[in-house]
Structure formats: C-alpha cells, structure tokens
C-alpha cells in the first residue's frame, strides 16, 4: 500500500471509488454503511484486504494514518492530556461490535459534523472542528483566570457548529471548568498533607539559669529523649494584678521570676 500526501492508498480498491485515493470523507461513508448493516465480518475483511499494511496479528494499528480512520471509532478530543488518541483496535467481531456500540452517539455527531463540513467546508475531518472548539474553551478559561478587575471579562467565542456539540452533550467549556476545579481540590488536599518536621531530640538543659552552678549528676535525668532536666532554683516575687477593667479590686500574685511558676 502506498502513501500519497499522508493519505493511505489501497492496492485493491473497490470499484465504487473509480480509482480515487482514500479520504476521510470516503471512508466515513463506508464505515457508516457497515454500522447500518452491522456486518462486522465484512468490515474486518474490508480493512484486512484494503489496508493490509496496518494489520498485524489480527490488530489494526492507527499509527501514521492521520485523520483517515477517525470516523471508524468517531474520535472525540479529550480535555485531559492524559487521555490519548486510540492507537489500535482488535479485528474480532465482538471487539468491533463493542466499539461501535460505545461510539453510537459520537458517530451520529460525526454524521452532522460531516454535513456541516460539506455545506461550509474548511476542515478535512470533524475532529478538527472539535479541536477548535476545545481550544476556544481552554483559551476562555485561561483568560478568565488571568483577568484584571478594571478590564471587562472576556466573552466566549461560539462557533457555528457548537449547536451540534450541545445536541450531543459535548460542552468543552464546562469540561474545562470541571478540570480546573478538580485541579484546585487536588492542590488543596496535597497542601494539607504537608507537615513540618520538628526535631524531637535535643541536648539542651532546661531551667539552667546560672551558668556558674555545678549540678550533681544525680539531679540530672538521662532518658531516651536526650534531654536533661535540672530543678529550678525558684526566686519568687509578688505583683499586683487588676482583676477587671475599671475595678479597684486587685489580686496579689506570687510567682517565680525564673520559670514563671505561680506559688
């Protein structure tokens, strides 16, 4: 099979195409007919005979095919960068049947988007329209996050085909906001898990106020904590404290000037 300008060209093309090279639009018509007839065995035979170079061990690989087979599984770009484009499908009847069943609504959306392309032109594959709508939504959310208070908020740019996307519950703007909310919640959760590590072991001596005092070893507590304790040599003082504001009644408090312990 030869490649002409990035589009696959079969060596054994059906007569219906009269020698023309394969295009995403032509294959969309073929795949639509197979979906309608539910003849999955014929579809597998069609892919095997016409695109044998992409078949290996009963697996059809999409690597290097561009937009050619997007209508086979109705590719819809995802907001998350973690969800990648499909790379292959298993050429078995149950696998193809499951694929078609899971992408029924997406293929119906492709039908209307191809009709829009036929009427207005400008795109080779419906996924390019979906990608354009996705980029508009991402740009709108980013500009909204960076807007200043003295500037009017940006307006969301709607495309003529956005009504088709809304019909099939595909709203990239809402998905971008939902992704931003999940990211914010994840960041907050991660921030809450941060804990400051404190040094528990210490070689300090507590209540050692007079450096000239020599302490007996028997008065020191040597424990696994690594901290030594020495008794405080209390030096008491008495102060007057007013109990309430504006009240003449006072209390006499006796406390240690060294360790602040009350008598």
Swiss-Prot record:
Do you know which InterPro entries this protein is assigned to?
Baculo_LEF5_C, Baculo_LEF5_N
Which superkingdom, per the lineage? Answer: Viruses
The keyword Transcription regulation appears for this protein? yes
Question: Keywords of this protein's UniProt record, alphabetized?
Answer: Transcription, Transcription regulation
Task: Please give the Pfam families that the UniProt record associates with this protein.
Answer: Baculo_LEF5 (PF04838), Baculo_LEF5_C (PF11792)
Q: What are the BP-aspect GO terms?
A: regulation of DNA-templated transcription
Q: What does this protein do?
A: Required for late and very late gene expression.
Family designation:
Belongs to the baculoviridae LEF-5 family.
What's the protein name? Late expression factor 5
Q: Which organism is it from?
A: Orgyia pseudotsugata multicapsid polyhedrosis virus (OpMNPV)
Q: What is the lineage of its organism?
A: Viruses, Viruses incertae sedis, Naldaviricetes, Lefavirales, Baculoviridae
């Amino acid at each position: 099979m030869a490649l002409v300008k990035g589009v696959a060209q079969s060596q054994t093309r059906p007569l219906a195409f009269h020698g023309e090279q394969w295009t995403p639009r032509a294959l969309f018509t073929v795949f639509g007919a197979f979906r309608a007839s539910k003849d999955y065995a014929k579809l597998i035979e069609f892919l095997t005979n016409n695109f044998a170079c992409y078949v290996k061990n009963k697996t059809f690989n999409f690597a290097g095919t561009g937009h050619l087979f997007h209508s086979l599984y109705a590719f819809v770009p995802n907001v998350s960068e973690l969800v990648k484009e499909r790379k292959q499908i298993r050429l078995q009847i149950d696998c193809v049947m499951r694929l078609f069943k899971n992408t029924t609504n997406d293929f119906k959306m492709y039908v209307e988007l191809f009709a829009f392309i036929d009427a207005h032109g400008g795109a080779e594959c419906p996924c390019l329209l979906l990608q354009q709508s996705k980029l508009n939504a991402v740009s709108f959310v980013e500009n909204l996050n960076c807007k200043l208070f003295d500037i009017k908020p940006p307006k969301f740019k709607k495309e003529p085909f956005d009504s088709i996307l809304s019909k099939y519950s595909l709203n990239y703007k809402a998905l971008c906001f939902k992704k931003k909310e999940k990211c914010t919640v994840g960041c907050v959760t991660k921030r809450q898990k941060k804990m400051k590590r404190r040094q528990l072991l210490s070689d300090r001596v507590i209540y050692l106020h007079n450096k000239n005092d020599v302490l007996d070893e028997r008065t020191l507590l040597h424990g696994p904590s690594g901290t030594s304790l020495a008794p405080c040599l209390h030096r008491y003082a008495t102060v007057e404290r007013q109990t309430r504001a504006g009240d003449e009644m006072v209390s006499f408090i006796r406390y240690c000037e060294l360790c602040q312990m009350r008598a």
